[in-house]
Amino acid sequence: MEVVKFEPDTEGIERRRGIKPFGNIGKIRVIKSTTAPRFNLYTTEVGIDCKEEQKQYIPYRPSLEEPAVSNAYVPPTIKRPETCSVKLSNLPLDMTRDRLHSIIKSHTNIFFMSPNLVMNRETGAFRGFAFVTLESRDDAVKLIKDLKGVAIDSLGLSAEIAR
């Protein structure tokens, strides 16, 4: 690596200093420095050492409370709790989604989403197991207890929490 001595372009600097500015320079204000407002961490209050005149320039006050408006948008991940899936196996190969839905509905009163039957990608044939999504893990445990001992076409239904 080569080290080159720095020589400023003094001639160019002097030439630029001689340029006369256009417009009324008296109306231009130059702010030397500004300081950002300080916030206390983990609170919603502005720092104690902030002066009263600085508080008026604070763009917003951080808030940890929920919005006061009841129709405020809440993302779906925050709105509903973590869902849980149950794997239903040992199902007959001629099973349909509607039939499985009616069988589960007849044995439990827990709300569940429509069952997803797992199909073979190449042939499109049912593979013998399905997944049911529920609102919580407690509902999943209740569904497993309710479906214990259920037989479909002389096949014992097996239910377990999906991994």
Curated annotation (Swiss-Prot):
Annotated ranges, domain RRM: 84-163
Keyword Lipid biosynthesis: no
One of the Pfam families matching this protein, by short name: RRM_1
A single GO molecular function term of this UniProt record: RNA binding
Keyword Phosphoprotein: no
UniProt KW keywords: RNA-binding
Family matches, as Gene3D superfamilies: 3.30.70.330
Name the UniProt record assigns to this protein: RRM-domain-containing protein ECU01_0840
